[in-house]
């Protein structure tokens, strides 16, 4: 079963059996909520729609974004992300993972953000497998 792994440098800190999720956060300066929808596929995380309530420093809304119900909606064409790299620090606040119509702070699985560990990676993985994004597809397969 393919699911979502969270960790760093191939070390798995948490696994979630979800086929899709929304990654949400508040811009560290503007305090504006951003959301990105992802599908979990064998080849990586596939970005779907993104939404934002307004622009923030260093994170401009694309020119083709459309305003619906107070949020800008847009899509970016990216190859599968394997892994998706995130900065995660106490100063910026935590990310949320939303699935099954509920949002959860990443600290539910990983503990609070720490200055000593300012990065996080998300990737699709075979649940219960020790394979990292680097060695995925190699081995006795």
Language-model segment annotations:
Residues 3, 54, 133-137:
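Compositionally biased, low-complexity repeat tracts
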């Amino acid at each position: 079963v393919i699911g979502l792994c969270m960790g760093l440098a191939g070390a798995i800190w948490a696994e979630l059996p979800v086929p899709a999720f929304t990654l949400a956060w508040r811009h560290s300066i503007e305090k504006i909520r951003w959301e990105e929808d992802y599908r979990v596929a064998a080849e990586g995380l596939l970005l779907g729609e993104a939404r934002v309530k307004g622009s923030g420093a260093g994170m401009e809304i694309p020119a083709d974004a459309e305003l619906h119900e107070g949020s800008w909606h847009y899509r970016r064409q990216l190859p599968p992300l394997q892994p998706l790299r995130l900065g995660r620090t106490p100063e910026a606040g935590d990310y949320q993972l939303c699935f099954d119509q509920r949002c959860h702070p990443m600290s539910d699985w990983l503990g609070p953000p720490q200055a000593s560990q300012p990065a996080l990676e998300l990737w699709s993985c075979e649940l219960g497998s020790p394979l990292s994004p680097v060695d995925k597809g190699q081995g006795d397969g």
